[in-house]
């Protein structure tokens, strides 16, 4: 059974993100780029002013391109998307707050992250992690190389 305030709780994340200036920063990761695609480090500001990192890979050629968005797993390390995907699609792999490359000032503990702050809705870590995921979606919606269809 869904709690009465369930929808309000999750809609609150979207409302909170409206007041965040994401200040995107892209920097090519030349060691990861190949003739078929360019890989960037993407930094964005998410909820509570937290800077998050994502791998952002764009195929070479004329776009726009469809996107494969690799949502973060329950672990400390996020890997760059597979080579074959990067050749044909824009690929994004988010490192949410606490994961490696997004671990300053907070480093997530495994196990333990799943229930961190669960006793109060505004301190539950997965509320902020959901915001991190939505921040990347907002970034993608504003990119010319992304096929939004």
Regions found by a protein language model. Name each.
Residues 46, 70-74, 96:
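Glycine-rich His-Gly loop
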Residues 131-148:
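Conserved acidic catalytic loop of the alpha/beta-hydrolase fold
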Residues 79, 83-84, 89-131:
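Cap/lid segment of the alpha/beta-hydrolase catalytic domain
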Residues 17, 75-79:
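Hydrophobic/aromatic-rich structural module bridging two neighboring secondary-structure elements via a short loop
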Residues 1-37:
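N-terminal targeting or regulatory segments adjacent to alpha/beta-hydrolase or S9 domains
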Residues 54-59, 63-74:
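Short beta-strand element of the alpha/beta-hydrolase
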Residues 38-60:
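A short loop-to-beta-strand scaffold at the N-terminal edge of the catalytic core in hydrolase folds
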């Amino acid at each position: 059974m869904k709690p009465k305030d369930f929808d309000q709780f999750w809609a609150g994340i979207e409302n909170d993100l409206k007041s965040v200036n994401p200040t995107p920063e892209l920097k090519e990761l030349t060691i990861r780029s190949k003739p078929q695609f360019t890989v960037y480090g993407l930094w964005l500001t998410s909820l509570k002013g937290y800077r998050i990192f994502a791998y952002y890979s764009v195929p070479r050629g004329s776009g726009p391109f469809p996107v494969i968005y690799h949502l973060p797993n329950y672990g400390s390390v996020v890997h760059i998307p597979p080579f074959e995907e990067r050749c044909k699609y824009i690929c994004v792999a988010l490192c949410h707050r606490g994961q490696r490359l997004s671990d300053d000032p907070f480093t997530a503990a495994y196990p333990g992250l799943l229930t961190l702050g669960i006793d109060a809705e505004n301190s539950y870590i997965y509320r902020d992690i959901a915001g991190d995921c939505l921040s990347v979606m907002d970034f993608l919606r504003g990119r010319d190389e992304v096929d939004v269809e």
